[in-house]
């Protein structure tokens, strides 16, 4: 990704600023320079905010990015154009903020555009989908982008020197290695769960095995001694439990069947005898009851006759009851007519009185209407009474505050005038500072060179002295070598090959005899005596060996001396006589001191000007704030005056409390009047409605009374006709028979009961005679005792069989469970063995004692170090390489970094590096980490990079090393920006993005040197 253009609106110190990165040519290094606090880092905050809605550091929130001097109703907006893989994109992101006068926050906005067909086309317009689009486009999240795009070297120095645990936190964030820890934890949890499950199965198996019933069988009891964990042996003996149980059950079943037949036979005999005895007893009892019932038969016949007479007189009785009810109804209707007539008279009198009350009340109608108009006109003022109270109360206070603010504004304007006069249009002369700094830099370089010449002169003289000494040593060694060669050549070298052959010759002599053929030469042996002096040969051999060693030593010394002379000559060739003689630097040091004094004087003047400008800026801001407050107070005064005038003109009152009292009194009078009038009118209406109802009721009752009299006459006629039909001559006869009507129901019930009992006895006696005919009765007690005895024996046998069946069923379930558990155990143990081993390895139980996550982090760290060493080797002349310290310990080990020194051919602690060397190692590590993160995040190509480092803390030598290192970054093919305010960097970097602060805002511009 390569930045093209960045537009900032109300962002940090930039109110309306555009940075065009097209001013930076391809692969060009440029410097971002400016005073402390001018907003250099805010440029990268803006880029990260545009892409991810966050700042370039975690410590800053989105609300901290908005300019404090932005207009309250204008948003903070960042527009960022960039190039990615030969395509152009533009992002517009607006931050959330609260407009002046609003309580709710105005939400942020996001728009993502892609350049197509000579114009930008909208791709996303919603924040969530837009963020996902950008993340997918870049292939990295905000944290990874910070590591790739901005390299804060101080952070990487801490990363370089940190312990394994600290590196682990950083690397796991960048490479999302928590997933490996989760995999390890998930696997460990699964293994733990499986092991717990297996142990639970063994416990269940042991419980089932212990609970298995042995039926007191000796063989089964011996089987139960087997341990529950010997699953193979248990499987072998389980069939014995089933077989033994079935044999015992067959015996119990046979015994029970025999006893069952005996019990059934005894029970049948007992039941038949009991039935016969009961039938005979019931036959005798029912015959006695039947004879007693027949004694009352004549009395029942008399009651039948009386019921017949009562049934004939029933119609006349009904007619008499109807007549009596009708006469009673007639009396009630006459009484109701009298009551209704009295109620009508009372209602007419009440209506007259209510009309008089209404007329008296309406005489006050005009006064009430006047009050009603007052209420309507002043209703709004009553509802907002607090507003007008506040207007009266605040008017004088606001007027006093307004006068005070005007006085303060006059005073502040005088201060602005005085400060402007002191400033006298002066501006800080930073250009002069840069020129002096450049001159000091050049003078220091010259002094450094002269001092180096002085050191070189000393080293040159030492080398010349050392050269002469080595030449003398070489001459002496050459003479010694000639002397040793002469001694070596003078020694007799004949028969030296027989040295160490004395034992062999003696062995051959012992095996041969005079006159035999020699096995070596084939001639006849004449004598076996020794004719070789082995001691003399050994002495000469030792002398030659000693001389050879001395010659080799002298030769090695000559080669070493010649090599050292060659090295000295090579070192001497680096020096020039002219530079060695130029070592006078005292005058230049005096000149540097003068330049420092001149720079100090200009710095003091610049600081004074900056202080006056800052003071003027504060005065102007205070003046602006006072003007805004005066306008606000003036607006409040006008609002209060308008409110007071409206109140007094409309209500006629100058005190709000008096108006409120008047308004509430008028309102209560109107409400009381309306309520009383409504009550009277409603009462009149109710009286009239009731009166109409009562008159209708009287008319209805009179008609009903006439109908009742007609009904009484018709009933009398029907009674006379019915008496003539029956033969009664007087009402007394009818009443006498009617008096007996209450007995009718009881008489009929007695008659019906007699008939049913008689018929029931006759049927039951006939049935019992049929059952007992020709049957013999035995002793029931003896039969019962025999049955109970057989029943008890049978129940005992049944209980024994049931108990055995239960035990068999219990054993069957247990055996099924045991087989199931053993099958599951065998399956789990076979399938989980490799998983158990894998879990232990991933948890750190391995040769390296590393967890899975730390193993992965070591892999990433080694890749980072490999990438970093490619640059570090170039930076340090192939001297240093970063290496991972190999060690074995439980936990997060193996992430410490050592440095390998090629000069000493061994590794040493990273803290042993000098400041400049540490800077080079940190920078190489930062670049290596950046490139590996790119590879892991999908191979995104970031064509630009920014290095943010406090170069002002470095000494001169380390700064030179840093500059050389940073200048070499152009070869990586990236646009590289360096953030710093160190003046020396301006002399080495030709393109500068200058960030200038003016009062409360900053501006930027590119300049070339």
Curated annotation (Swiss-Prot):
SUPFAM superfamilies, per the entry: P-loop containing nucleoside triphosphate hydrolases (SSF52540), Rad50 coiled-coil Zn hook (SSF75712)
Xref: Pfam families: AAA_23, SbcC_Walker_B
MF annotations from Gene Ontology: ATP binding; ATP hydrolysis activity; endonuclease activity; exonuclease activity
Record-stated family: Belongs to the SMC family. SbcC subfamily.
Highest rank taxon of the organism: Bacteria
Function: SbcCD cleaves DNA hairpin structures. These structures can inhibit DNA replication and are intermediates in certain DNA recombination reactions. The complex acts as a 3'->5' double strand exonuclease that can open hairpins. It also has a 5' single-strand endonuclease activity.
Keyword match Hydrolase: yes
Originating gene: sbcC
UniProt keyword Translocase present: no
Summary of subunit composition and partner proteins: Heterodimer of SbcC and SbcD.
Taxonomic source organism: Staphylococcus saprophyticus subsp. saprophyticus (strain ATCC 15305 / DSM 20229 / NCIMB 8711 / NCTC 7292 / S-41)
Coiled-coil regions listed: 178-214, 243-309, 337-503, 578-842
Name of protein: Nuclease SbcCD subunit C
Source lineage: Bacteria, Bacillati, Bacillota, Bacilli, Bacillales
Record: residues binding ATP: 34-41
Keywords, comma-separated and alphabetical: ATP-binding, Coiled coil, DNA recombination, DNA replication, Endonuclease, Exonuclease, Hydrolase, Nuclease, Nucleotide-binding
GO process annotations (BP): DNA recombination; DNA replication; double-strand break repair
């Amino acid at each position: 990704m390569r930045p093209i253009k960045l537009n900032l609106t109300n962002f940090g110190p930039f109110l309306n600023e555009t940075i065009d990165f097209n001013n930076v040519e391809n692969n060009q290094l440029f410097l971002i320079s400016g005073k402390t606090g001018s907003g250099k880092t805010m440029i990268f905050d803006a880029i990260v905010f545009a892409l991810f809605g966050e700042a370039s550091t975690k410590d800053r929130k989105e609300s901290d990015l908005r300019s404090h001097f932005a207009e309250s109703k204008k948003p903070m907006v960042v527009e960022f154009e960039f190039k990615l893989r030969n395509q152009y994109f533009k992002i517009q992101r607006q931050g959330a903020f609260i407009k002046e006068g609003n309580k709710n926050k105005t939400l942020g906005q996001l728009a993502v555009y892609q350049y197509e067909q000579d114009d930008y086309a909208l791709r996303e317009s919603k924040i969530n989908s837009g963020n996902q689009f950008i993340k997918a486009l870049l292939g990295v999240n905000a944290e990874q982008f910070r590591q790739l795009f901005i390299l804060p070297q101080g952070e990487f120095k801490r990363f370089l020197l940190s312990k394994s645990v600290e590196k682990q936190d950083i690397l796991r964030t960048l490479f999302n290695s928590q997933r490996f820890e989760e995999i390890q934890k998930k696997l460990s949890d699964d293994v733990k769960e499986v092991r717990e499950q297996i142990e639970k199965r063994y416990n269940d198996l042991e419980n089932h095995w212990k609970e298995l019933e042995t039926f007191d069988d000796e063989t089964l009891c011996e089987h139960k001694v087997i341990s529950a964990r010997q699953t193979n042996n248990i499987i072998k003996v389980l069939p014995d439990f089933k077989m033994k149980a079935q044999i015992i059950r067959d015996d119990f079943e046979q015994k029970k069947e025999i006893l069952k037949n005996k019990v059934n036979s005894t029970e049948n005999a007992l039941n038949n005898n009991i039935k016969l005895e009961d039938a005979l007893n019931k036959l005798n009892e029912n015959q006695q009851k039947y004879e007693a019932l027949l004694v009352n038969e004549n009395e029942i016949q008399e009651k039948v006759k009386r019921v017949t007479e009562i049934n004939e007189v029933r119609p006349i009785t009904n007619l008499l009851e109807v007549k009596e009810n009708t006469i009673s109804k007639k009396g009630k209707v006459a009484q109701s007519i009298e009551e209704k007539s009295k109620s009508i008279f009372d209602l007419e009198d009440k209506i007259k009185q209510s009309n008089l009350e209404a007329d008296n009340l309406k005489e006050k109608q005009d006064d009430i209407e006047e009050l009603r108009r007052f209420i309507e006109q002043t209703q709004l003022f009553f509802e907002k009474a607090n507003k007008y109270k506040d207007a009266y109360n605040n008017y004088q206070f606001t007027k006093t505050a307004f006068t005070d603010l005007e006085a303060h504004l006059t005073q502040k304007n005088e201060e602005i005038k005085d400060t402007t006069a002191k400033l006298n249009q002066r501006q800080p002369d930073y250009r002069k500072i840069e020129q002096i700094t450049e001159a000091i830099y050049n003078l220091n370089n010259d002094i450094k060179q002269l001092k180096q010449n002085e050191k070189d002169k000393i080293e040159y003289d030492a080398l010349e002295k050392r050269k002469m000494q080595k030449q003398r040593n070489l001459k002496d060694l050459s003479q010694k070598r000639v002397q040793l060669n002469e001694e070596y050549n003078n020694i007799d070298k004949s028969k030296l090959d027989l040295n160490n052959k004395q034992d062999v010759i003696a062995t051959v002599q012992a095996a041969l005899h005079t006159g035999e053929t020699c096995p070596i030469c084939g001639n006849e042996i004449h004598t076996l005596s020794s004719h070789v002096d082995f001691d003399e040969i050994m002495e000469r051999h030792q002398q030659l060996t000693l001389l050879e060693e001395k010659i080799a030593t002298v030769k090695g010394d000559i080669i070493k001396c010649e090599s050292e002379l060659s090295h000295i000559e090579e070192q001497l060739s680096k020096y020039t006589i002219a530079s060695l003689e130029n070592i006078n630097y005292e005058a230049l040091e005096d000149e540097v001191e003068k330049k420092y004094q001149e720079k100090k004087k200009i710095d003091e003047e610049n600081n004074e000007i900056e202080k006056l400008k800052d003071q003027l800026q504060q005065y102007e801001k205070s003046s602006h704030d006072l003007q805004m407050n005066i306008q606000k107070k003036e607006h409040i005064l006008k609002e209060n005056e308008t409110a007071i005038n409206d109140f007094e003109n409309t209500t006629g009152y100058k005190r709000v409390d008096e108006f409120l009292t008047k308004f509430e009194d008028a309102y209560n009078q109107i409400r009381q009047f309306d309520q009383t009038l409504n009550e009277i009118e409603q009462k009149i209406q109710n009286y009239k409605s009731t009166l109409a109802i009562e008159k209708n009721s009287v008319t209805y009752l009179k008609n009903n009374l006439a109908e009742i009299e007609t009904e009484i006459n018709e009933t009398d006629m029907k009674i006379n006709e019915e008496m003539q039909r029956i033969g009664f001559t007087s009402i007394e006869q009818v009443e006498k028979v009617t008096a007996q009507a209450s007995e009718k129901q009881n008489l009929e019930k007695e008659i019906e009961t007699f008939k049913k009992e008689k018929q029931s006895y006759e049927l039951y006696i006939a049935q019992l005679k049929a059952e007992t005919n020709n049957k013999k009765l035995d002793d029931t007690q003896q039969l019962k005792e025999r049955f109970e005895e057989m029943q008890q024996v049978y129940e005992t046998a049944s209980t024994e069989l049931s108990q055995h069946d239960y035990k068999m069923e219990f054993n069957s379930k247990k055996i099924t469970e045991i087989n199931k558990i053993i099958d599951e155990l065998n399956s789990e143990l076979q399938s989980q063995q490799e998983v158990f081993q894998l879990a232990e390895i991933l948890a750190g139980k391995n040769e390296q004692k590393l967890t899975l996550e730390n193993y992965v982090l070591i892999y990433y760290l080694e890749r980072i170090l490999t990438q970093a060493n490619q640059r570090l080797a170039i930076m340090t002349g192939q001297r240093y390489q970063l290496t991972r310290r190999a060690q074995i310990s439980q936990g997060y080990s193996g992430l410490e970094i050592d440095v390998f020194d090629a000069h000493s051919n061994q590794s040493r602690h990273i803290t042993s590096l000098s400041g400049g060397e540490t800077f080079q190692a940190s920078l190489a590590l930062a670049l290596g980490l950046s490139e590996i993160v790119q590879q892991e995040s999908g191979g995104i190509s970031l064509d630009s990079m920014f290095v943010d480092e406090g170069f002002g803390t470095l000494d001169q030598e380390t700064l030179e090393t840093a500059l050389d290192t940073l200048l070499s970054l152009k070869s990586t093919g990236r646009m590289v920006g360096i953030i710093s305010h160190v003046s020396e960097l301006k002399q080495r970097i030709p393109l500068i993005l200058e960030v200038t602060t003016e009062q409360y805002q900053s501006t930027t511009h590119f300049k070339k040197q």
